[in-house]
Amino acid sequence: MTTPSMEDYIEQIYMLIEEKGYARVSDIAEALAVHPSSVTKMVQKLDKDEYLIYEKYRGLVLTSKGKKIGKRLVYRHELLEQFLRIIGVDEEKIYNDVEGIEHHLSWNSIDRIGDLVQYFEEDDARKKDLKSIQKKTEHHNQ
């Protein structure tokens, strides 16, 4: 079972490897704004739990288990960003909002949010209807 912190690391490592082809402790530390020694400790734990293989000074490689969960975590993050955009959350608030909620939702909830995103993406009229409702409620709340 992964903790929210483990998930943040796995997600970041997965994204770095997808983007650069590799992930170094220094890259992970910079991306997560943490000290390299914290990264080393977590990477050793993730190695022990078989999410990745870590060789000091040689970098790290995600195992198939690590890749699978990494892909799912990136999907969850991107889906939540897409959902918040659809419902009209201010762009500058989206990242922090996703970071605040992503670890607290069950995968069942994520799947249902995915259904909602798909529903809105399939027909632009649905997005327009939502915006119309939001305008009415904004008007009533003023």
Swiss-Prot record:
Regulation: DNA binding is strongly activated by Mn(2+) and Cd(2+), but it is poorly activated by non-cognate metal cations, including Co(2+), Fe(2+), Ni(2+), Ca(2+) and Zn(2+). In the strict absence of divalent transition metal ions, MntR has a low affinity for DNA.
Annotated GO MF terms: DNA binding; DNA-binding transcription factor activity; manganese ion binding; protein dimerization activity
Tree of life domain: Bacteria
Residues noted as binding Cd(2+) 1 in the record, renumbered to the chain: D8, E99, E102, H103
Domain HTH dtxR-type: 1-63
Comment, domains: Contains an N-terminal DNA-binding domain and a C-terminal dimerization domain. Contains two metal binding sites per subunit, site A (corresponding to metal ion 2) and site C (corresponding to metal ion 1), which both contribute to the metal selectivity of MntR. A large metal cation is needed at the A site to correctly orient and position the C site ligands. Smaller, non-cognate metal cations bind at the A site, but disrupt the C site, blocking the full activation of MntR. Binding at the C site also favors Mn(2+) and Cd(2+) over other metals.
Summary of subunit composition and partner proteins: Homodimer.
Similarity comment text for this entry: Belongs to the DtxR/MntR family.
Annotated protein name in UniProt: HTH-type transcriptional regulator MntR
Species name: Bacillus subtilis (strain 168)
